[in-house]
């Protein structure tokens, strides 16, 4: 019996920093990061090229309480450094699972991580390595969602997979409204008109303009990542 082929050859996975916390209130939960890496490894074994953009909200958020009274640009740089810490942890967990991971940072920290160079990133992906993009876009005032849209467009990803704690986009908050229903798919224009808050406007506009679809799915739901990559009805597809 022949196995179904993956629906995508090259993907950009956007992981929030909060996703690494698991049930903890702060930081990186070891069991959670190991489970995530196992799911990523399963997808790479299908021959899919995986790049990751990771957030830093489990350590520091430039727009959150810890940054009150702080210069916004300074706070954003601190948030970028938090993403580097997360990227190193993720790469370490991947290397222990027999994956080969490369961290590429938008901010130069040469003793610790490689600088982001697009041709090198593409080479790593072609070689079957997982590339983890750290430090967002390298600029303050831009979110890691925008970094995911930017890197996704740069590397020619077929889709941005936004991993969240909810299994898609709903008509309302499913935890507050029991009648809320999940969208199977909707257009960028519909999502923007309904103000569904899937990504910030800059990230969303970039994906729309580059005709780069976004699929929102739950990273907590076991096997969801693989189902998304296989093109199954999982999460919510936002298309042009």
UniProtKB/Swiss-Prot annotation:
Homohexamer. Catalyzes the reversible phosphorylation of UMP to UDP. This is Uridylate kinase. Coiled coil: none annotated. One of its GO terms (biological process) is 'de novo' CTP biosynthetic process. GO terms for molecular function: ATP binding; UMP kinase activity. Inhibited by UTP. HAMAP family: PyrH_B. It is found in: Cytoplasm. Keywords: ATP-binding, Cytoplasm, Kinase, Nucleotide-binding, Pyrimidine biosynthesis, Transferase. Belongs to the UMP kinase family. UMP binds at residues 56, 76, 137-144. Its main location: cytoplasm. It catalyses: UMP + ATP = UDP + ADP. PANTHER family: URIDYLATE KINASE (PTHR42833), URIDYLATE KINASE PUMPKIN, CHLOROPLASTIC (PTHR42833:SF4). It comes from the Bacteria. ATP binds at residues 14-17, 57, 61, 164, 170, 173.
């Amino acid at each position: 019996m022949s196995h179904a082929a993956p629906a995508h050859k090259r993907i950009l996975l956007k992981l929030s920093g909060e996703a690494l916390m698991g049930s903890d209130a702060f930081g990186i939960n070891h069991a959670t990061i190991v489970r995530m890496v196992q799911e990523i490894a399963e997808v790479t074994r299908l021959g899919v090229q995986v790049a990751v953009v990771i957030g830093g909200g489990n350590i520091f958020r430039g727009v959150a309480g810890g940054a009150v009274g702080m210069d916004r640009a300074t706070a954003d740089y601190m948030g970028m450094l938090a993403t580097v810490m997360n990227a190193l942890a993720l790469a370490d967990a991947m290397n222990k699972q027999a994956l080969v991971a490369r961290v590429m940072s938008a901010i130069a920290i040469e003793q610790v991580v490689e600088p982001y160079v697009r041709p090198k990133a593409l080479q790593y992906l072609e070689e079957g390595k997982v590339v983890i993009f750290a430090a967002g876009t390298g600029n303050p005032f831009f979110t890691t969602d925008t970094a995911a849209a930017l890197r996704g467009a740069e590397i020619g990803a077929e889709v941005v997979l936004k991993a969240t704690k909810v299994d898609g986009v709903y008509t309302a908050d499913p935890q507050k409204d029991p009648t809320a229903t999940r969208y199977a798919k909707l257009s960028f224009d519909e999502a923007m008109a309904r103000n569904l808050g899937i990504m910030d406007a800059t990230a969303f506009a970039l994906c729309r303009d580059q005709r780069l679809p976004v699929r929102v799915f739950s990273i907590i739901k076991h096997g969801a990542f693989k189902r998304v990559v296989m093109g199954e009805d999982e999460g919510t597809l936002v298309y042009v």
